[in-house]
From Swiss-Prot:
GO terms for biological process: translation. Its cofactor is Zn(2+). This is Large ribosomal subunit protein bL31. Keywords: Metal-binding, Ribonucleoprotein, Ribosomal protein, RNA-binding, rRNA-binding, Zinc. NCBIfam families: L31, PRK00019.1, PRK00528.1. GO terms for molecular function: metal ion binding; rRNA binding; structural constituent of ribosome. Part of the 50S ribosomal subunit. Binds 1 zinc ion per subunit. Binds the 23S rRNA. PROSITE patterns: RIBOSOMAL_L31. GO terms for cellular component: ribonucleoprotein complex; ribosome.
Amino acid sequence: MKSDIHPAYEETTVVCGCGNTFQTRSTKPGGRIVVEVCSQCHPFYTGKQKILDSGGRVARFEKRYGKRKVGADKAVSTGK
């Protein structure tokens, strides 16, 4: 194996936007990494996850514009 090809692997402090900090190891120089979210504040880990209802979007579209009727297709296609 070649020697001196790997970067230095040093102790690093990770600081989250919520104020949580923890220690890890990283090759990033400086010894400090700042992140926006961590496992203490991310919605997936905290259980405050918002579930998107795509079926509700279809129902809302049909409510606004109605379902398309078969007779309407023929009138549009022969309207030259």
